[in-house]
Amino acid sequence: DGLVADVNIPRGTVVLAATPIGNTGDASARLIALMEGADIVAAEDTRRLYALANRLGIRVPGRVVAYHDHNERDKADGLLDQVEQGATVLVVSDAGMPTINDPGLAIVRRAIERGLPVTCAPGPSAVLDALCLSGLPTDRFCYEGFLPRKHSERVQHLRALKSERRTIVFYETLHRIDESMADLLDVLGPNRKMALCRELTKDYEQIRRGTIAEIRQSVVDDPPRGEMVLVIAGASEEEADAAAPATLSIEDLAVLSVDRAQEDNLRIKDAISQVVAEHPLSDGSLANRKQVYNAVLAMKD
């Protein structure tokens, strides 16, 4: 009849389907029907797919292929060739919705480029669950994925978000939560409201709510385990204004460039490039490096 049974999806379609993030009971009827009816299932981890099917008491009769971060670009076109021939390809990740910190984006982009249909069977999402349970504003938010691993990059990333007015959502691991909370405290200060959400939908689900300082102390006193989502209040108007970078004049940039060249033993042109990149103008553009260089020369006259 040209449709995948029970889900009203035309054959010859790529379907992204959300899988449970912890509680098997959250598997939707559409996910189950697709697992049973898709011609091909592209799974981030085939073992976890079969384990889910076993818990659901179903079979996966279609061809199952591994589709993960390391091969998704190479596999995308081969899967889409099958879609062109009328196959339904179901894409699933280990937990949650494909493409959200999981494989899937490559096949979506290539399908769009090739004019092939793509649709979703929505479902569980750790980002949205944590946001809803945090008690923080949900009308405007930004999702930042995992915080950078390296301390210096993490601090730089947080500084760039210091004036962000929207609620901010991160993922974090148990191995880095202590360091990340210390950096959040240093960069964003002690008083912002936040929530640390762990083991969402599982037996040991826990939501810790409080200020950054309070949650940081709770992490020290009682280190959390499991998968975590951090939800942090956006900056107040006063915080955003205070964190907004001041626009520096060409002369200011010249002084900073000379200092940078001396401190880091750089050529002046290299120092200028660094300083200009670090201090954008109020409209987001970068100062003219030649003008800064001329200002440096004028300082020497």
Write out the residue ranges for each language-model feature.
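Short active-site oxyanion
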Residues: 35-41, 115-119, 167-168
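General beta-strand structural signal in soluble alpha/beta enzymes
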Residues: 43, 118-123, 170, 196
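Generic beta-sheet signal
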Residues: 13-17, 85-93, 141, 166-170, ...
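Short Gly/Thr/Asp-enriched flexible loops that form oxyanion-binding sites at enzyme active sites
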Residues: 99-114, 181, 185
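A contiguous loop/helix-start segment that scaffolds small-molecule binding in enzyme catalytic cores
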Residues: 3, 11, 88, 167, ...
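Class I SAM-dependent methyltransferase SAM-binding "motif I" and its flanking Rossmann-like core
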Residues: 106-164
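Glycine-rich, flexible N-terminal cofactor/catalytic loop recognition
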Residues: 1-68
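Conserved helicase motor
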Residues: 65-74, 146-150
